[in-house]
From Swiss-Prot:
Expression by tissue: Salivary gland (at protein level).
UniProt-reported outcome of changing residue 24 to S: No significant effects on binding to the host receptor, induction of cAMP accumulation and erythema formation in host skin
Role: Potent vasodilator. Activates mammalian ADCYAP1R1, a PAC1 receptor, and induces cAMP accumulation in host cells. Causes the development of erythema following superficial injection into the rabbit or human skin. Influences adaptive immune responses mediated by host dendritic cells. Reduces surface expression of CD80 on host dendritic cells stimulated with lipopolysaccharides (LPS) and induces concomitant increase in CD86 expression on a subpopulation of these cells.
Gene Ontology CC terms, in alphabetical order: extracellular region
Name this protein carries in UniProt: Maxadilan
Subunit comment: Interacts with human ADCYAP1R1.
Species of the source: Lutzomyia longipalpis (Sand fly)
Length: 86
C-alpha cells in the first residue's frame, strides 16, 4: 500500500515539475483555455456576421451570436479536462 502511495506521489510531483518547467501553472493554463475559447468564439462570430444582412444583424443581441454558445461549450470542455487532470 505504501508503495502505491509513493508511486502516486512521484507521478503527481513529476507532472507538477513538468508544468513548472514549462512555466505554466494552473492560472496560466486557465488563461490559455480562455484565450483558446475566445478565438473559437470569435471565429464563429466572424462567420455568422459575414452572412447576416444588416436588418437582421442590427436586431441581434450579442448573446445571440454563435460565438456566445461556442465559448460556453468550449469552457465546459476545458473545465472537464482540468478536473480530469489532462
Amino acid at each position: 500500500m505504501k508503495q502505491i502511495l509513493l508511486i502516486s506521489l512521484v507521478v503527481v510531483l513529476a507532472v507538477f515539475a513538468f508544468n513548472v518547467a514549462e512555466g505554466c501553472d494552473a492560472t496560466c493554463q486557465f488563461r490559455k483555455a480562455i484565450d483558446d475559447c475566445q478565438k473559437q468564439a470569435h471565429h464563429s462570430n466572424v462567420l455568422q456576421t459575414s452572412v447576416q444582412t444588416t436588418a437582421t444583424f442590427t436586431s441581434m443581441d450579442t448573446s445571440q451570436l454563435p460565438g456566445n454558445s461556442v465559448f460556453k461549450e468550449c469552457m465546459k470542455q476545458k473545465k472537464k479536462e482540468f478536473s480530469s487532470g489532462k
